[in-house]
Amino acid sequence: MFDDLTAAGYSETEAYKLIYKGGLTIKSTQDLTMQTICDEEANNPSNYPSDAKYSFQLSFEVKKADGSYKTYTNQTMLSFYKKKTNNDDFSINYSSPDECNAAIAQYEQDVLEDGDSIVEGSEAVNITLEPQVAMTVIDQSTGEVKALVGGRGDKSGNRTWNRATDTCRQPGSTFKIIGCYAAALDAGGKTLASVQDDAPFTVGSKTFNNYDKSFGGFTSIRWAITKSINIVTVKTLQDIGVELGYKYAEDFGISTLTDSDKNLSLALGGLTKGVTNLELTGAYATIANGGVYLEPKFYTQVLDHDGNVLLDKTNTQNTRTVIKDTTAWLLTDAMKDVLTQGTGKLARFDSQIAQAGKSGTTTSNRDCLWAGYTPYYTCVVWGGYDDNSKQSGKLTSYPKNIWRNAMSRIHEGLETKDFVQPDGITNTTVCSKSGLVPLDGICDNDPRGSMLTTEYFDTDTVPTDSCDHHVALEICADSGAIASPYCPNKTSKVFITGAVSGSPEYEFMADDTFMNTICTLHDATSLINSSPTTTDPTNSGTTPGSTDGTAAGAQTGEAGTGTGAGSGAGTGGSGSGGTDTGSSGSSGNSDR
């Protein structure tokens, strides 16, 4: 509100006096019932790992023997012991407040030298329960902040540190939607069916990995969202351009970005400063609101002591369209899968009300998040240690627990709703290995089974090209090479094309060497001495072979030309979550 008053023309001094001494009436957007629910769930021990820790804020002043003064804090304490133990992972989180006090006393002994003394009354200690949390609930249809949690544990005072508004932390994989996929679907020419080869990937000196270090081959954007796959996300941002992803993130209301964030790590939420919980919630509320950003607001009106309106946000609000309503719906549909098939199953609460969301963790689980929404409300929960300490990966589910339990209570008694599908959405069958139009008899005869799937599209982005990741070749049954016109026994086999080295697809790949290797076992006399046969991949039996010199080669969706070598390749499509395969990814720096 201070910024709003100064923006309205009041000086900083006037604004301060009005807020703290002016007898203002503030019409808050806070819902007391929701706030109580969020406070209770944020402080409910059953939502957290059993091994709670305690950290502390420390400050004391020492008068040195030479008469100078030096201030010591919890940060100097941490640096002191990291250096003393030669351990960069040294932590000053302890199992009880008593252990904290004992550690502080030991530190004071360790830093005091002969003739030094602690200045009386200078010591200040504030012990904090860890891990900590931040939580924001927004009504996306109005932008009103209904509840805000700045931390858990006993409140030490008024106007204290609020982790939801005052602290920037890494958003991890929750930023895949904000910094990559929203832009990719809205303006980058991508669809939920678009695929990337989930395979080893290095750009310059930076090697990107999925959180479980596995690879899934050709993987659709839908499945990459569902399973939080890093490599697919980074390759997608590389395709559409970092500048585009950065611009969209800014449009979503993320104000903490810097030019140093204009790199591929943007896709994974590896940011210079991080984001606030409030702004991340506002970004997800934009998607929930059909792509329209409404600046989060904490009040509707501010009146002076005489009842005069000083500030009015009832009908005035910073608003803009960030993404098309079709893009918002497609992202939402993919994020619904996260709760049913992906990394967010634990977050889902028992209700017929539709739910969508995205998980996020960062390197060594220093941050863990769940960002989710319903047709009613958007809520983001962050968890982590104030000093950025590591967390066990098995103990980072508490943001999902808090979100599930709080949102379940908030939605009690509300009417069952789904997200409204806008005009301009259609569905069609594609090949899940390319995201394009399937080749008849080929994409459905991949060695692993049919790769056909149905996906939703904006009507302007429905694929028209044919699959470019499948090809059918006539193979000599005797040599295993591509059949020549003289091979008497041929079989038609479907191969993958376009995979990179290290991809799981490579096992089924017809690479350039194979494509240029024609059988040399047979010549014209082979047809005289043998009864030729050809095996059709769609039929287990055999059919009479062709001897006119046009049967050999690649079979595709387009009519081929020429003799000796067959026709060219078509195109196909990448699939929706349930049919594509891909490794679960991680984000931030190693998130999922």
List the predicted regions and their residue ranges.
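Active-site-adjacent bridging/hinge elements
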Residues: T6-L18, V145-R159, A249-S260, T378-G383
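Soluble, non-transmembrane domains of envelope/secretory-pathway proteins that act on or interact
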Residues: G204, Q355-A356, G360-R592
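Mid-domain, small-residue-enriched loop/turn segments at the edges of structured enzyme/sensor domains
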Residues: T207-N210, G241-G282
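Short coil/turn segments at secondary-structure boundaries
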Residues: A8-G22, D51-S59, L237-I240, K247-F252, ...
